[in-house]
Amino acid sequence: MANVSSSNGLEKRPKLRFPGFDEPWKVFKAEELFQNVTDKNHPDETVLTIIQGKGTLPREQAGRNIHYDDASLSNYKKVEQGDFIIHLRSFEGGLEMANEAGIVSPAYTILRCKRPHSSLFYDAYFHTDEFINHNLSKSVEGIRDGRQISYEAFKWLGIPYCEPTEQEQISSLFSVLNERIAKQRNLVESLKKYKRGLSNSLFDRLSAGSESRLCIFGDMMTILQNNTFSRDNLSVGGNGVRNIHYGDVLIKYGAVLDLHSENVPVINAEQDISKFSALSYLRNGDVVFADTAEDYTVGKSTEIIGAENIAALSGLHTIPCRPQDSFAPMYLGYYFNSDYFKKQLYPMIQGTKVSSISKSEIIKTKIIVPCLQEQTRIASIMSALDDRIDAAKHTTKDLIDLRSGLLQQLFI
């Protein structure tokens, strides 16, 4: 590929092009390139669902509990493979391509290209930042949850067009890149599945063996003081006292939290933390549980490491605990996030819309305590697997960033 000059407003050329292509691109009004198609009365066709960023999928494969009246299917719109769909969330995610023929909601607008083209070319273009945030945004009407794309405004938007042979080159590149990203994502999911199975195997074997002690949580762990600072009382960056927020425990942190390497929010300087004694500040080996969640992820925890010379407190909706005995670093982090331990928590969870677990309940659970050598072995195995998963995630991000960069440079 070669870098070329940017558009001067008269001749439009992308910044990056495949060899052999130098002709300027044309820009047509959307209605000149695409026909607004309304083709109804096909109730026997496959009902399709929009998956943002992925196009269409047969409704029964979408994994969603969507209710609809069979009698209304005659009013649904027919789409052909390669058509484009303006759906209810297009204002934030772009247009989606029909991956197969079928019928879709009558609320959608169906676009069919009038000129020779590559559908994958426009599928890529309709997901670029330039199109969504600088072009499509001109056709958005309404505010907040009422936002939608007005076709009457959309049809006047300028849409680029180049020779089909160049479109094919560009679409082939993104097809290969998308396939590579999909495989990388599958690798991450496979590694996570393997990790869960390995964790189950390791701790189930410990529970069945005679070389481990089974101890009561309340006899092994001391519950520490936590604070109730909200997100508004925290800042990202700085050298203040770190704060472990329950939302980060649930979503951001893994079984182990390294305070030296993780960017943990700090408590704003104007907040009074004088009531917290030295014993309240987190140390290596302490474990922080999230005691509230919107689902059964409640009880997720993270073990603290890298706490040397770093002041950190446990925050809102957390249960910070300190082991009374010596444990191998990271062992408790992996044990408390194992299915073996979580199964003990499930009967203790309270609430309907919001799930929670109390300190008085968690102290009744049991901890498997093998010898230090076995603890170290388990922690080492699980940590190495986490490193492998993190590396695979970073590769996924790098590939997505590469795709994003190419999307910006290969289109005008």
How would you label these PLM feature ranges?
Residues 1-26, 156-157, 162-213, 373-412:
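Amphipathic alpha-helical segments with low aromatic content
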Residues 4, 21-24, 67-73, 143, ...:
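Short, solvent-exposed loop/turn positions at domain surfaces
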Residues 10-14, 88, 103-109, 142-165, ...:
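A short glycine-rich beta-alpha junction/loop motif
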Residues 13-41, 205-233, 240, 364:
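Non-catalytic DNA-recognition/assembly elements of restriction-modification systems
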Residues 16, 28, 129, 152, ...:
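Structural detector for helix-capping/boundary residues
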Residues 62-63, 75-131, 150, 245-249, ...:
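A short beta-sheet element
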